[in-house]
């Protein structure tokens, strides 16, 4: 199993690999270093980091989080929830959340931990996290979903609760589906 990439490269079916990941690149960093050591050509889609191995293609997630925060504040939103893992294991989500928090603090608003819910990038996770957020009574007027799939689940939960989008709650997704 550990030599899959060598067998693939030796087959001459491709000149290189494109590796897709969503936060899980940290788990496979040792394998990526091994690919480099063996001379396997690859590019990785994911969070850009100075510690990551190989060529990386990704988004400016921190900057995007700032833009979302600025947009929602410009729209008059002040209680902005974030749905998506904000820990380091999902660096894309964490950077988006960090950008949002920077903008909130610059506007004199301390981010409320009660408005953050962990969710992986699925519709069901967004649905569940938003239901939980609504049930908590924390009170929010916007949701920044870490991905569009999470946002779709959030929209379903808001509709179930009789909340109007964007009237009662603004929703922003990420990924452009």
Where are these predicted regions, by residue range?
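Alpha-helical recognition/docking segments in bacterial nutrient-uptake
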Residues: 1-70, 74, 135, 139
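Short beta-strand segments enriched in small/hydrophobic residues
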Residues: 16-18, 79-86
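Glycine-centered flexible beta-alpha turn that most often forms the glycine-rich phosphate-binding loop
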Residues: 169
């Amino acid at each position: 199993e550990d030599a899959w990439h060598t067998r693939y490269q030796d087959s001459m079916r491709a000149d290189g690999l494109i590796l897709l990941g969503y936060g899980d690149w940290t788990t496979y960093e040792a394998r990526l270093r091994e690919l480099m050591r063996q001379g396997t050509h690859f590019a990785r889609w994911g969070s850009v980091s100075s510690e990551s191995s190989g060529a990386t293609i990704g988004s400016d997630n921190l900057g995007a989080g700032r833009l979302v925060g600025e947009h929602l504040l410009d729209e008059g939103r002040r209680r902005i929830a974030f749905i998506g893992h904000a820990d380091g294991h999902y660096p894309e989500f964490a950077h988006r959340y960090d950008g949002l928090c920077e903008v909130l603090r610059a506007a004199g608003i301390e981010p409320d931990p009660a408005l953050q819910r962990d969710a992986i990038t699925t519709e069901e996770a967004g649905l569940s996290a938003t239901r939980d957020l609504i049930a908590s009574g924390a009170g929010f007027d916007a949701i920044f979903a870490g991905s569009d799939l999470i946002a779709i689940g959030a929209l379903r939960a808001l509709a179930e609760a009789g909340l109007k989008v964007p009237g009662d709650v603004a929703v922003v997704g990420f990924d452009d589906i």
